[in-house]
């Protein structure tokens, strides 16, 4: 397997509960390495731009407001088959359906407040990484 990169967000419900370290620990224990990380408060423009794919969905406004409600931690993760590895450790979007030992099973409050975002493909990972990071901010 090739070493690849993926993008992750530790969402407001997790940062509000001081879970950044616990979530990052689970990512690292899954074989992912944090090669870039920053804690930010997402602007409306950032949230709407990042989630533009959902613009026509009924939950779009609520999602944007949620992502602006508290700080988030945006990260670039690196590891073998990073996208799949990250999605496996995140668990299902609905925490009630997430496997034991996954981030969402352990920490998510609901489908909406589900602790983490992770890229769903290598192609989207690159787009999402480029949305928040300049190449010189990523230190492998």
UniProtKB/Swiss-Prot annotation:
Pfam families: NDK (PF00334)
GO molecular function term, any single one: nucleoside diphosphate kinase activity
Gene Ontology CC entries for this record: cytoplasm
GO biological process, one term: CTP biosynthetic process
Keyword Cytoplasm: yes
Positions that bind ATP: 11, 59, 87, 93, 104, 114
EC number assigned by the record: 2.7.4.6
Keyword Transferase recorded: yes
Compartment(s): Cytoplasm
UniProt entry keywords in alphabetical sequence: ATP-binding, Cytoplasm, Kinase, Magnesium, Metal-binding, Nucleotide metabolism, Nucleotide-binding, Phosphoprotein, Transferase
Requisite cofactors: Mg(2+)
SMART domains cross-referenced by the UniProt entry: NDK
EC class of the enzyme, as a word: transferase
Reactions catalysed, as given in the entry: a 2'-deoxyribonucleoside 5'-diphosphate + ATP = a 2'-deoxyribonucleoside 5'-triphosphate + ADP; a ribonucleoside 5'-diphosphate + ATP = a ribonucleoside 5'-triphosphate + ADP
Residues the record marks as active site: 117 (pros-phosphohistidine intermediate)
Cited InterPro entries: NDK-like_dom, NDK-like_dom_sf, Nucleoside_diP_kinase, Nucleoside_diP_kinase_AS
UniProt family annotation: Belongs to the NDK family.
Subunit and interaction comment: Homotetramer.
Job description of the protein: Major role in the synthesis of nucleoside triphosphates other than ATP. The ATP gamma phosphate is transferred to the NDP beta phosphate via a ping-pong mechanism, using a phosphorylated active-site intermediate.
UniProt name for this protein: Nucleoside diphosphate kinase
Species, as recorded: Erythrobacter litoralis (strain HTCC2594)
Lineage, broadest ranks: Bacteria, Pseudomonadati, Pseudomonadota, Alphaproteobacteria, Sphingomonadales
Gene that this sequence comes from: ndk
């Amino acid at each position: 397997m090739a070493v690849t990169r993926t993008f992750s967000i530790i969402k407001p419900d997790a940062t509000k509960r001081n879970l950044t370290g616990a979530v990052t620990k689970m990512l690292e224990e899954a074989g992912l390495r944090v090669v870039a990380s920053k804690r930010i408060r997402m602007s409306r423009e950032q949230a709407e731009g990042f989630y533009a794919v959902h613009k026509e969905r009924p939950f779009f406004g609520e999602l944007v407001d949620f992502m602006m409600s508290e700080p988030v931690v945006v990260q670039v993760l690196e590891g073998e088959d990073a996208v799949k590895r990250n999605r496996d450790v995140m668990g299902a979007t609905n925490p009630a359906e997430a496997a034991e030992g996954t981030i969402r099973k352990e920490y998510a409050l609901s489908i909406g407040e589900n602790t983490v975002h992770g890229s769903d493909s290598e192609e989207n990972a690159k787009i999402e990484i480029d949305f928040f990071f300049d190449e010189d901010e990523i230190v492998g």
